[in-house]
Amino acid sequence: GLKEWAMKKMCPIAVRLAKKCDGTLATKIKEICDNL
């Protein structure tokens, strides 16, 4: 669906932003994204 597509598009950006401030958060986000 559209939501899943949008999430997949946003994931790399979210991971990049999270990496700048919090590495563990980035890892969590990446795991969630990989499971989409």
From Swiss-Prot:
Superkingdom in the source lineage: Eukaryota
Keyword Membrane carried by entry: yes
Gene Ontology molecular functions: monoatomic ion channel activity; toxin activity
Keyword hit for Cytoplasm: no
Tissue localization of expression: Expressed by the venom gland.
Localisation: Secreted; Target cell membrane
InterPro entries (UniProt xref): Ectatomin_sf (IPR036261)
Keyword terms: Disulfide bond, Membrane, Secreted, Target cell membrane, Target membrane, Toxin
Disulfide linkage: C11-C33
GO CC annotations on file: extracellular region; membrane; other organism cell membrane
Self-association state and partner proteins as the record states: Heterodimer of subunits A and B; disulfide-linked.
Family, as annotated: Belongs to the ectatomin family. Ectatomin-Et subfamily.
Protein known as: U1-ectatotoxin-Et1b subunit B
